[in-house]
Design a protein with these regions (language model features):
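Catalytic active-site module of serine/aspartate enzymes centered on a nucleophile-bearing elbow/loop
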Residues: 304-342
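Conserved alpha/beta-hydrolase
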Residues: 89, 96-121
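Alpha/beta-hydrolase-fold enzymes
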Residues: 163-248
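Short beta-strand/loop motif that positions the catalytic acidic residue
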Residues: 280-282
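N-terminal cap/lid segment of alpha/beta-hydrolase-fold proteins
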Residues: 34-70
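Hydrophobic alpha-helical topogenic segments used for membrane insertion/localization
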Residues: 2-24
Length: 342
C-alpha cells in the first residue's frame, strides 16, 4: 500500500514536471507601446482625406482607426476592414485610398493586440477571446452608423480577418450590405485539437506568456514571408516593417484556433440576411491557407449550408496569399471595385 502511494505521488510529480517543460514560457521580443488618447492628425491626399482617431472599446482599450474618404464627394458606402494575423491597419492604406478616390469611405483599424490598439492589459500579441475581437468590430460598425448616417456598410476581412468576418455574420449579418474576403482561411479539423493544446498552455504557462511548444506547433510569426506575395518589393517591406508582430502569446493562439474551429458550427449562424452578397478573392498558390480548390469549395458550401445564397469565389492564378499586394494588384483592385459598385 505504501509503495502504491509513492507511485501515485511520483506520477503526479512527473506529470506536473512534464507539463512545465512542455508548456514553459520562453522570452519574447514584443515591446509594449503607449497608446495615445483621442484624435491625432487630419491630412488631405489629393481628393482624399485621412483622419486617425481612437475609438474606446467597452473595456476601455483605445482602438486605433484610420478613416480615409473622398473629399467633397458623397459616400457610396463605408468599407470596414479587418486585417490579418501579425499585421496592422496601415498595410491597407493603398487599397483604401484607391477606394476613396472611387467614392467609398474606408475604416482601417488595428485589431486589439496589434499596431496601436494596445494598453497594459492588452499588450502586443494578445487577443483575449473571439467574443472580444467581434465586440470590437461591432463597436466600429456602430461608429460607422453614427458618423455615416444611411450609408451601407461593406465588411472586408483578410486572412484571419476573413475568419472574424464570417463569425461576425452569426448574429449581425443584417448590419452589413456586402462581405468581401481575401486570403480566405479554410476550416481545419485540427483546430479543435489546437484549442485543447493552447488551453493547456494557458493553464500551465499562463495566458499572457509564450509557450515554446505553442510557438512550434502554430508557426505564427515565421520569418519566411515569401509565401505572402510574388512581389519581392512587398516581401521586403514586410520584413522591414517594425509594426509587424513576431508572434502571439498563449491566449492569442487559443483565440486564433477557436475562431477557425467555429467556422463549421452552423448552429451558431442565425442567417438573417440570406441574400447578402459575399465575394472571396484568393490566389491559386495560397493552398496552405485556403485549402486550394477543395478548401474553397468547402468554404463556399458551408456558407450556402448556413443559408447564404450569393456566394462567389474568385481564385486568381499565379497569385499567393496577399492578392492586394501582388505584382498585378490592379486586377484585384478592379475586381474589388466592381463588386462594391454592383
Amino acid at each position: 500500500m505504501k509503495k502504491k502511494k509513492i507511485w501515485i505521488k511520483g506520477g503526479i510529480l512527473g506529470l506536473g514536471l512534464a507539463s512545465y517543460l512542455l508548456f514553459k514560457s520562453e522570452p519574447e521580443t514584443i515591446v509594449l507601446k503607449e497608446a495615445v488618447p483621442e484624435k491625432v492628425t487630419t491630412t488631405s491626399l489629393e481628393s482624399v482625406t485621412q483622419e486617425d482617431i481612437y475609438l474606446i472599446a467597452s473595456d476601455g482599450l483605445p482602438l486605433a482607426l484610420t478613416v480615409i474618404q473622398p473629399e467633397n464627394q458623397p459616400v457610396k458606402a463605408v468599407v470596414q476592414v479587418v486585417h490579418g494575423l501579425l499585421e496592422h491597419r496601415l498595410r491597407y492604406s493603398g487599397l483604401a485610398s484607391f477606394l476613396a478616390r472611387n467614392g467609398f469611405a474606408v475604416i482601417l483599424s488595428d485589431s486589439r493586440g496589434h499596431g496601436d490598439s494596445i494598453d497594459e492589459k492588452n499588450p502586443l500579441g494578445q487577443m483575449p477571446s473571439v467574443k472580444r475581437m467581434l465586440d470590437d468590430q461591432l463597436k466600429i460598425t456602430r461608429f460607422i452608423n453614427e458618423h455615416f448616417t444611411n450609408s451601407p456598410v461593406y465588411l472586408y476581412g483578410h486572412s484571419y480577418g476573413s475568419v472574424l468576418a464570417r463569425l461576425y455574420l452569426q448574429k449581425n449579418d443584417q448590419k452589413i450590405a456586402k462581405l468581401l474576403m481575401t486570403g480566405t482561411v479554410q476550416y481545419e479539423k485540427k483546430a479543435k485539437y489546437g484549442v485543447v493544446i493552447a488551453l493547456l498552455a494557458d493553464l500551465f504557462a499562463g495566458k499572457q506568456n509564450f509557450s515554446w511548444v505553442i510557438k512550434k506547433l502554430s508557426n505564427f510569426g515565421s520569418t519566411d514571408k515569401t509565401w505572402l506575395t510574388n512581389d519581392e518589393v512587398q516581401v521586403e517591406k514586410v520584413l522591414r516593417d517594425p509594426r509587424m508582430l513576431p508572434g502571439y502569446n498563449n491566449i492569442g493562439v487559443t483565440t486564433i484556433w477557436e475562431g477557425v474551429r467555429r467556422l463549421k458550427d452552423v448552429s451558431l449562424f442565425a442567417c438573417q440576411n440570406p441574400e447578402l452578397p459575399i465575394l472571396s478573392i484568393t490566389g491559386a498558390e495560397d493552398v496552405a491557407i485556403t485549402g486550394g480548390r477543395k478548401g474553397l469549395i468547402d468554404t463556399q458550401r458551408t456558407l450556402r449550408t448556413i443559408g447564404y445564397q450569393n456566394v462567389e469565389m474568385i481564385n486568381f492564378p499565379k497569385m499567393k496569399h496577399e492578392v492586394i499586394n501582388e505584382i498585378n494588384q490592379e486586377q484585384v483592385y478592379q475586381t474589388i471595385l466592381d463588386f462594391f459598385n454592383r
